[in-house]
């Protein structure tokens, strides 16, 4: 709820002045950019909220690297939400993620995706990092990584990727062509 309220206020506050049609078009572009940054911030928060800022940046850069890789979707939200879906039992026209089958586990773990009230400061950091990554203000410290995992697991796919760097407790990999 807090996230949606902040997003709505930010969109209204940033609508440019000028002609009505230009304002609507610019507001639409701004809303898209803001939505993309919220998707990225959510992923950074849920995947790396217990990491240093460098670790959070690494996780965010993997999403950006995937957006820029033709093997993945071409928007931040599509990358974060990538995975199989199924029809909702309430409304078959509404598709929902298949539990535990998403690219990023938090997105389809069946738990609430609401930001924890006692971690708003961490979400603020994640949002700032997301904005800087989206704006191109952060150099890639992952050496082009498109994948990562926690250092306490060894997924089968790790053997097929090139390890690039370890930041905090995440190991990053690049998927070669």
Q: Language-model segments: which ranges?
A:
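C-terminal segment of classical bacterial N-terminal signal peptides
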Residues: 14-21
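Bacterial extracytoplasmic/cell-wall-associated proteins, especially those involved in peptidoglycan
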Residues: 21-177
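Sec-dependent N-terminal signal peptides
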Residues: 5-13
């Amino acid at each position: 709820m807090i996230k949606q309220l902040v997003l709505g206020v930010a969109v209204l506050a940033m609508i440019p002045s000028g002609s009505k049609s230009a304002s609507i078009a610019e507001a639409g572009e701004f809303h898209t950019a803001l939505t993309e940054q919220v998707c990225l911030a959510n992923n950074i928060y849920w995947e790396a909220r217990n990491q240093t800022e460098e670790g959070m940046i690494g996780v965010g850069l993997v999403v950006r690297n995937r957006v820029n890789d033709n093997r993945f979707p071409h928007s931040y939200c599509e990358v974060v939400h990538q995975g199989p879906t199924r029809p909702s039992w309430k409304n078959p026209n509404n598709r929902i993620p298949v539990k535990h089958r998403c690219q990023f586990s938090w997105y389809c773990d069946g738990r609430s995706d609401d930001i924890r009230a006692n971690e708003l400061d961490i979400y603020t950091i994640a949002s700032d990092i997301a904005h800087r990554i989206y704006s191109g203000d952060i150099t890639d410290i992952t050496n082009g990584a498109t994948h990562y995992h926690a250092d306490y697991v060894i997924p089968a796919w790790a053997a097929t990727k090139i390890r690039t760097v370890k930041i905090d407790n995440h190991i990053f990999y690049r998927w070669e062509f």
